[in-house]
Amino acid sequence: MPIHLAIINPKSPENMGSILRAAGCYQAQSIRYTGERYARAKAFQTDTKNVHLDIKVSHVDEIICKITDTKLTKVAVELVEGATPLPNFIHPENSLYIFGPEDGSIEQGIVDQCEHVVYIPTIGCMNLAATVNVLLYDRLAKTTQMPVDDKVIKNSRDTNNRTKAK
């Protein structure tokens, strides 16, 4: 189930570092972003797992490409009236998840191009990186392709973790 992330004008290097790590953990195929703020923030080296070596990360002028995105289902993730609560959402097979900036919202014109709009039903708005993590976890939790053995644990845990459940 291909996953692509689109971040509109990301601001915080810490958020982008967390988003990169989440993209690696949840096996996203690509991350695209608009704006110039992240290019300046990259100097802070927040990609501690070097995810950018495995996942295509690219700057784009337009968050939705009318030519290449025709096979992707576009999903805006935003606190928008009329949006579907994430717990009730069925994730499409090939998805482009679009997230707004930390200090703004997704423009109406972009929302209008999306097949779905979802929101996370919390009290107050969430941090951008937290929103990406929750959405990606929700997608994983609703899939039938989850591993059920210890192999994923052994491959994912920190090198100092050798703890076992009884």
For each feature predicted by the language model, list its residue ranges.
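A short acidic, often aromatic-flanked loop/helix-cap motif at beta-alpha or helix-coil junctions
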Residues: 62-67, 82-83, 125-127
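Short secondary-structure transition/capping segments
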Residues: 42-46, 87-89, 130-131
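Structured adenosyl-cofactor binding patch, chiefly the S-adenosyl-L-methionine
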Residues: 25, 113-151
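Active-site/ligand-binding-proximal alpha/beta "capping" segment
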Residues: 80-118
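RNA substrate-binding interface of SAM-dependent RNA methyltransferases
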Residues: 1-78, 140-166
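Short, acidic/turn-prone active-site loops that include or flank metal/cofactor-
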Residues: 36-38, 101-104, 121-126
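Generic recognition of short, well-ordered alpha-helical segments
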Residues: 17-18, 109, 130-131
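Residues that form or flank phosphate/diphosphate-binding pockets in enzymes
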Residues: 14-15, 84, 105-106, 126-127
